[in-house]
Amino acid sequence: MATFVELSTKAKMPIVGLGTWRSLLGKVKEAVKVAIDAEYRHIDCAYFYENQHEVGEAIQEKIQEKAVMREDLFIVSKVWPTFFERPLVRKAFEKTLKDLKLSYLDVYLIHWPQGFKTGDDFFPKDDKGNMISGKGTFLDAWEAMEELVDEGLVKALGVSNFNHFQIERLLNKPGLKYKPVTNQVECHPYLTQEKLIQYCHSKGITVTAYSPLGSPDRPWAKPEDPSLLEDPKIKEIAAKHKKTTAQVLIRFHIQRNVTVIPKSMTPAHIVENIQVFDFKLSDEEMATILSFNRNWRAFDFKEFSHLEDFPFDAEY
């Protein structure tokens, strides 16, 4: 079983990576070091997570220890929508590169398709509490990102949270130089994203699954929300394979050729989450897990839905 997916650029993206959203300062550095020791080579970062300097420290320490070389690692980061105006893309990118203490990124993503008002606030709101859109669009940001590829600062570009209409707009953009290599979206058995995955794969775009375990630690979780890790059917499948429910959920993506980036700050879980290459789910088990789909999102971003380019109104 391949432990990577091949991008349209022929680069190899490790199929399991470490997610770092909500990885707390003071803890994320250790988490990244544990992950590298456990043979993770793919680390998923973002300007918005405000912890890239610690991720960078961990990477540098591991490189200095000769535990890993930079070229063995696959580092992804993202530009936030308050930076969509062309000069700001570079400003945000330069901070990311400096924080991560790297000379290049393997993939740079657009974090979210809607442009927000520029400024220091990640979620700019008017006096009524409504989000304010910005002048820059994802197409403007893409042009600035293409320059980073031309300069050798980024190997490839991608998107996140895009629906297929938005990807079409990007692919059909006049003068497009570089196609997106991946679309990173929320994906798990309650949101299987079958049509979107099929569409992306048909265009040579890989899919990366964030919140593959259903984001159990999200701050806005309600007691009545479904819990994937506690799902009796998934527990049953896990017991049969002598694996944890998390390992089954991660394996589910791997068998769909979907890259998966579970986040954990617990060393034992970090190690466990990559021990997913020594078992295989049967076709029947895959079908059972796929049948759980209910188009339920842990992240619905409803507060952005009044702005242009909201991605989740489309079927896929």
Curated annotation (Swiss-Prot):
GO terms for biological process: estrogen biosynthetic process. It catalyses: 17beta-estradiol + NADP(+) = estrone + NADPH + H(+); testosterone + NADP(+) = androst-4-ene-3,17-dione + NADPH + H(+); 17beta-hydroxy-5alpha-androstan-3-one + NADP(+) = 5alpha-androstan-3,17-dione + NADPH + H(+); 3beta-hydroxyandrost-5-en-17-one + NADPH + H(+) = androst-5-en-3beta,17beta-diol + NADP(+). The gene is AKR1B15. The keyword ATP-binding does not apply. Signal peptide: none annotated. This is Aldo-keto reductase family 1 member B15. Coiled coil: none annotated. Transmembrane segments: none annotated. The active site is at Y49. It is an enzyme of class 1 (oxidoreductase).
